[in-house]
From Swiss-Prot:
Top enzyme category: hydrolase
UniProt record, GO biological process: symbiont-mediated degradation of host mRNA; symbiont-mediated suppression of host gene expression
Family: Belongs to the herpesviridae alkaline nuclease family.
Residues flagged as site, Required for function: 166, 203, 225, 227
Species of origin: Epstein-Barr virus (strain AG876) (HHV-4)
Protein origin, superkingdom: Viruses
EC number: 3.1.-.-
Annotated function: Plays a role in processing non linear or branched viral DNA intermediates in order to promote the production of mature packaged unit-length linear progeny viral DNA molecules. Exhibits endonuclease and exonuclease activities and accepts both double-stranded and single-stranded DNA as substrate. Exonuclease digestion of DNA is in the 5'-> 3' direction and the products are 5'-monophosphate nucleosides. Additionally, forms a recombinase with the major DNA-binding protein, which displays strand exchange activity.
A GO term from the CC aspect: host cell nucleus
Entry annotated with the keyword Ribosomal protein: no
Name assigned to this protein: Shutoff alkaline exonuclease
Pfam family, one: Viral_alk_exo
The organism's taxonomic lineage, starting at the top: Viruses, Duplodnaviria, Heunggongvirae, Peploviricota, Herviviricetes
Keyword hit for Cell wall biogenesis/degradation: no
Length: 470
């Protein structure tokens, strides 16, 4: 890689220095040819990150990652710094705790997501939470060629709506539901420290601590994945088909009125699935409560090939979601609070992409807890996971100009009015996690082998039935 001082635009050079380009570089290919065995992950991922950070630290001022790697290298065999070989072997021998420190540096450097160039670059060669299901189904065809992150979203569309309302949902969870629990609301890119091929970024996590620039996850940490439902956005108007059902829910918050509200649109977000039947892939929430069975829809039986779905359904069927109905600011001097709580039998759909999204978040945060000292002896190091479904209405002339969440947290004037929040706990069986990650890792390995002459091997711990992969 060219020296930064020789580049007309070092930032432009950085944005093109992907993991794929690193693997194809003459320096890397020469280094690999001199090894007595193929290079391994995650060490090669960290070697790449070292090379990237070494180039950008001259104008970013961030030296922590490279300094920590240097402390792991036994020999400095060059006046210009350690060789790739020395760096690789230092990282190959690193402990999971040391690798987690390296990943924590990366997370701290990449906060801001779409506004952070490094966050975009690091997705190359990574199976992210949003790509996990497609990788299992179709292979990682886009993992080494991810589409650029788009920030130009139509204001009135669903993506812009979700981005606009996400902070409001975080405020509701942190202030009104969790009672001002310690929380982190902005995360960088979190690479799995033990394998280097999976990565996630969280919306919100409560019960976390700070250690300098690092986030310390604990065995009490709770992840919240936020979904703002654009298709339920409605107006306070008798001509809006959703409004009458919302009015009934607001006047009498209960299971029956919530069922009416959810089914007020053509493709409702909750699907009724009786025991022993296969859910569709249409949306991400299910129920087995007969009260939701409003129309006769024939469903296939669970059968051969549905083992993971069956295991996940069995683990989640008993889950109780909590619906929080919010007060109307036009009736409460602009104040939005929790009007009522309604428990409902709603759980996640294990055939939907969002299930795999939170599965990978659960796995990686669990790795951070185990390898960063956040877990107490004798306690499960796994975090809790919830998916949050938020419903909004458009602003009305009757709404006060200034609205607050609780008594003092100002609601941005550009954001719609939150009317209800559904919090759904997610249970992730170990067998489902192992099989899912094993399948995805095998797909990543096969694609890398066919794409790169210097493809690094994947850790054997990801392969439940394959002892041949080092």
């Amino acid at each position: 890689m060219a020296d930064v001082d020789e580049l007309e635009d070092p930032m432009e050079e950085m944005t093109s220095y992907t993991f794929a380009r690193f693997l194809r570089s003459p320096e890397t290919e020469a280094f690999v040819r001199n090894l007595d065995r193929p290079p391994q992950m995650p060490a090669m991922r960290y070697v790449y990150l070292y090379c990237l950070c070494e180039q950008i630290q001259e104008f970013s001022g961030e030296t922590g990652f490279c300094d920590f790697v240097s402390s792991l290298v036994q020999e400095n065999d060059s006046q210009d710094g350690p060789s790739l070989k020395s760096i690789y072997w230092g990282l190959q021998e690193a402990t999971d705790e040391q690798r987690t420190v390296l990943c924590s540096y990366v997370e701290s450097m990449t906060r801001g997501q779409s506004e952070n160039l490094m966050w975009d670059i690091l997705r190359n060669g990574i199976i992210s939470s949003s790509k996990l299901l497609s990788t299992i189904k179709n292979g990682p065809t886009k993992v080494f060629e991810p589409a650029p992150i788009s920030t130009n979203h139509y204001f009135g569309g669903p993506v812009a709506f979700g981005l606009r309302c996400e902070d409001t949902v975080k405020d509701i969870v942190c202030k009104l539901i969790c009672g001002d629990a310690s929380a982190n609301r902005q995360f960088g890119f979190m690479i799995s420290p033990t394998d280097g091929i999976f990565g996630v970024s969280l919306d919100l996590c409560v019960n976390v601590e700070s250690q300098g620039d690092f986030i310390l996850f604990t065995d009490r940490s709770c992840i919240y994945e936020i979904k703002c439902r654009f298709k339920y956005l409605f107006s306070k108007s008798e001509f809006d088909p959703i409004y009458p059902s919302y009015t009934a829910l607001y006047k009498r918050p209960c299971k029956r009125s919530f069922i009416r509200f959810i089914n007020s649109i053509a493709r409702p977000t909750v699907e009724y699935v009786p025991d022993g039947r296969l859910p569709s892939e249409g949306d991400y929430l299910l129920t087995q409560d007969e009260a939701w069975n409003l129309k006769d829809v024939r469903k296939r039986k669970l059968g051969p090939g549905h083992d993971l779905v069956a295991d996940s359904l069995a683990a989640n069927r008993g889950v109780e979601s909590m619906l929080y109905v919010m007060t109307d600011p036009s009736e409460n001097a602009g104040r939005i609070g929790i009007k009522d709580r309604v428990p409902v039998n709603i759980f996640i759909n294990p055939r939907h992409n969002y299930f795999y999204q939170v599965l990978l978040q659960y796995k990686i945060v669990g790795d951070y807890v185990r390898h960063s000292g956040g877990g107490k002896p004798g306690r499960d190091c796994s975090p809790r996971v919830n998916i949050v479904t938020a419903f909004f209405r458009k602003r009305s002339p009757l709404d006060p100009a200034t609205c607050t969440l609780g008594s003092d947290l100002l609601l941005d004037a550009s954001v719609e009015i939150p009317v209800a929040v559904l919090v759904t706990p997610v249970v992730l069986p170990d067998s489902v996690i192992r099989k899912t990650l094993s399948t995805a890792a095998g797909s990543w390995k096969a694609y890398a082998d066919n794409t790169f002459d210097t493809a690094p091997w994947v850790p054997s711990g990801l392969f439940a039935d394959d002892e041949s992969t080092p």
